[in-house]
Regions:
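Non-cytosolic beta-sheet module surface loops
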Residues: 56-58, 101
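Histidine- and aromatic-enriched segments that form or immediately flank copper-ligand environments
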Residues: 59-81, 109
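Bacterial N-terminal signal peptides
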Residues: 5-15
């Protein structure tokens, strides 16, 4: 339920903001109660033309990848470290997010609104 409200707040914030701007998002690698490693939140939202700044935080001891291929994002975050990644959301659509090192661990999406 918390994810729903977070996603809704992000959609409302993105869709009601004016022209493209800067979007700052924090994404954390966590382990679910079912012992599944995921990046949260699993859905990210931006507007076409936004400059997106991601702060990737890996709370595990193992390294994990984070890839949004449509925007040339392909990073490895070492265990216990964080990494800042910046890109421009220059096209609208729904784009997959995955861990290119452990694809079974991570599934997500970046939604870029027109």
């Amino acid at each position: 339920m918390r994810r729903f409200w977070l996603a809704l707040a992000l959609v409302v914030g993105v869709s009601t903001s004016g022209p493209a701007g800067e979007v700052n998002l924090t994404v954390v690698n966590v382990v679910t109660p079912q012992d599944v490693k995921i990046w949260e939140p699993t859905s990210l939202f931006a507007k076409k033309g936004d400059s997106v700044m991601l702060k990737l935080i890996n709370r595990h001891q193992d390294e994990h990848g984070y890839e949004v291929a449509a925007f040339g994002v392909k990073e490895v975050v070492e265990g216990g470290k964080s990494k800042d990644v910046k890109f421009t959301a220059d096209k609208a659509g729904i784009f997959p997010i995955k861990c290119h090192l452990h694809p079974a661990h991570v599934v997500g999406q970046l939604v870029v609104l027109e």
